[in-house]
Structure formats: structure tokens, C-alpha cells
């Protein structure tokens, strides 16, 4: 995730922070007063308020220098104890910087020993035999040899550690002027040996490992522990053990909740609309046609898709997608595996049924007799089931770093069982639609401008396949555009880390897809049910189905509808699946049969099929066989169901 080869130059910028935190702040404006220092010696000022005290200790949840100090009971502390708290914060920020230098540096554990030595230096308390007037506390500076080892193992540190400066990194000792405290030997300058953490490092390195600290909101886990492996849903910023938070910081929290709310609202509406379409065209409608089957099966696919969303927001988006801090849901999380499988089988089946509808439209226009329609049902269902079984077997369903649902996140699987087969299906459907448009164009050239009924009949099917097909194509375009920029997004993770290290207080976001494009991607997926309802669920065809349904003609319901004039049953069309309110006499039944025969033809003219329903006057085109649509599906009787 963290591209070390392309981002090494950027990582060096982290050391700008290092420049600040590695200045030895307890050596304020050291001056030598014209003293000619011996080779290997530095000089320092005496702080009369400084003391030798215990190290304040690390916090329970964040280890720092407890195991990296030679003697935690003897730490040089200037002014008051609060300076230790300040230095502790600086050390913590320094360790954060070192965490992200692991790809460039070696022996960083020793560097951490050196950092602790700089900010919590060993303390030398002068005895009265040396300073009879007053005992003073003096710090032991880090030895030049230790500084050079830190720099040699991590060249990036050379920009911030000037090991040649004897005032900060003496080779032998630091001289302090103790004349005012009664020391007279050596011209009043007392040498305090430098501190070399090598001995401490060699003694404690086996028990004190490199301390990694991740800036908030990144979390620290042990990647070598199978419990926290990447396969369990942890996204590591290699080579560190820092993982991305869940939900991924691609967008602001406000924008994530906007997408959650959009998904809740549209999915619920789409679910209800699809239930209505299945009930209308699949259950109440006794007159079957291949287009009614297409509507029914496509709407059933949308129901499955939206069920995924309903289950997800029922559990809670963040609870389902992020079952633990820093961990994205994977297939072994039952709710993720189940919702992911629902979504995949729904979206795949939906693509296949959209393609089937396109093929049927083309077959009607070209008067091509298709094979038994049951083969479409068998193929679409079987292919959809196989496409979900394969990724389930490969544990390929997971939430991913930024999404609203669990789905297939392994590239090989998603390309093999979705993008490639569905891409082929969309291509076939698109070719059919283009050919249909061409056929309509040829027909309309011979149609009188005064008689445009045939053209109007084609608006709904074309509007449907265009909107739904366009939505599917947008999903493809967005996905492959996102994939083409995935490397760029990964490379820019270092910018996100730099923002976290800068500690400016502003909200840091990772690079990712454009928010509007991402929003529209999920918007279209949840719009299918509403689109089909608006085109077919509100049609005269759907109203006729309900008027003739047993539900509205039920003895307990029909009187209520008549009483309040909700539905005008006198104007309804009687066709095979309807209920006839006329008398039961033999003549009435014969009249009813004749009426139903005529009504069936009228109903066909309202049907959703793309066909020329009437002859055009004066040498115009003639209509193809009306009964082709029923050749593969059991047709309804011409008589009343009652």
C-alpha cells in the first residue's frame, strides 16, 4: 500500500519535522565566551534550577523510553518536571517519523535509544567536593560516535543531525564553567563525559524492539499475527504496522453519511417499486409474455440488490462494514458474505435480463422466431448462480477500503465472474438496441406524420433499455477509470501520511475517486427499481392488470372502491385474466368471450413489446405475426378466468 520506491524523496520531507524535534532544547544558546575548546570537547551552560530526577514514565497505552534509558531514576530535568512531559510529546512525534522511515533506514531501534538519550539525558550531580558552594545538576550529551552510527544507518537523518557540532554531540565530554559554585581546577571548567547508549542498547535490544507509533486516525496492529493479517480485513501501510481506519478517510464523515442516507432512501423506494412490478407483471397478470417475464425477473433482481442495502442499514453501515476498529468486513463475517452474495447475484442477473429484453425487442422488430424462452430463464439463472459460487469458494467477498457494501474485491475474481461476462452481455444488448433503432428509423420514414401512434408505442421500451443500459455502462466506465487510477491513489498515500505528521489540525484525506462520480455510481445501482416502476408500473397496461385482478375484485374490496369512486370498473378492459361483472346467461358469456377476444388484441397494442401494432394506410408497412410472443410461453386462455 505504501509505495516505498516512488515515495522515498517525499519521505525525506518528514525530516523537516525532525529538524525541529531534534534540536537539543535543553542547551539554550550555548556560548563558549571565546574559550578555545580542546578537540573532542563541547561546552554547556549551567542551569541552577535543573535537577536530577526520575523519568516520569511512559503512559500505559504508549511505550516510549522506559526500556531505552540507561537509568530511568537519574534523568536531567531543567526548570521543572513539566519539561519531561513536553519532551515526551516530542519523542512521540519523532518515533512516528521514524516509523515511516523503515523502508529507507536500518538500525532504527538504536536510533530510538539515541533519541531517548537526547531528550532524557543521564544526569550528573556534582558532589560538594567538586562544587563546595552548591551542588549542581549537569546533563550528559550524546556522544558523537552514537550520532554518527544513527546517521550512517539512516542517511536521511544526516539532514537533521549535525554530528560534527561538538556543542551538541561531543566526542569525549562537555565542559561546564563551575567557578561560581566553587570549582577552581582546570580554570573552573568541569568535564562531564558524553553518554553512549551502545551498552544500554546491547543489553536491552532483545527485550526492547523498535517502537512504531501511528498518527491518529491510523491504528497499530501486529501484521505478523494471523489474527491481524490483511486477509482478515486490515489494510497496512507497508512497511509499517499502521493500518487505515475504517471507514477509509477518502471523504469527509459528512459526505459518507450523505451517501448512507441516499442509499437508505433510494434502496427502500426501489425495493417497494420492484415488489409492485413483480406482483403486477408476475403474479396478478395471468396473460404471460416474454416481456412480462423480463420485467418480472429484472425487478426480482433489483429486489435482491436492494435487500442487500436494507439488511446493511438495518444492521448499520459502519457496524457491518467495519466490525472492529481498523478492520474491514470480509466474507468470514457472515453479514458481509451474505449481503455481498445477494448484491452480486442481483446485479449479475439484472444485466442478463436487460440483455434478454434487448434481444426480444430486436427479434420482434426483425420478425425472428427465438428458441424456447425457457432457455433464457435457465441460462440467466444458472449463470448468475455460478458467478456467485466461484467467488464464494475463493473468499473474495469483502467490504474494501471505501464502499457502501460488501462485494468481490479480488481483481481476478471480479473480472472473471462479473466484468467480463456482463461486459459481453451488455455489448450484445447494445448491438440489439442499435439495430432496433435502425429498424425504427427505416419504418418511420414511411409513417405519416399524422399517424405517430406506432412511434409513441416504442417510447417506453426504448426509454427503459436506454436508461438502464446507460446506467450499467456508467458502472463499467467508472470501475475501469477507478482501476486505472488505483496506482496513483496508492502513491498518494504518502501525502496523506505527511498531512498526518504535519499536525496542522486540518482534516487529512486520502486520494480517491471524485466524490460526485462515486455518489452517482451508487445512485444508479439503486435507481433501477424506480426506473422500471416509472416506465412500466404506471402504464395503462399495469392499471388494467390491477383492475382485472382478483384483489380489487374481491367481494370485500370492490364495493369499497365503487362506493368512493376510486376505480371506474365500468370503463375497464376485459381480457383473459379479468373478472366480468355481467350476468351469467349463456348469451352474456358468448358476448364476453367475443369481447375478450377483441380486448386481447387491444391489450396487445398496449403491451410493452416493440412491434408495429397497426397497418399504416396507403402502402405503409404491415404488422408481423402478433402471436410470436406467445410461442415460447404458455399463453393465457382467451376466455375469462371466471
From Swiss-Prot:
Residues 584-611 form a coiled coil. It is found in: Membrane. Disulfide bonds join 52-123, 65-116, 143-194. Residues 47-197 form the FZ domain. The keyword Coiled coil applies. GO terms for molecular function: transmembrane signaling receptor activity. Residues 1-26 form the signal peptide. Residues 286-294, 366-375, 438-460, 536-642 are cytoplasmic. Residues 614-623, 632-642 have a biased composition (Polar residues). Pfam families: Frizzled. Belongs to the G-protein coupled receptor Fz/Smo family. This is Frizzled and smoothened-like protein B.
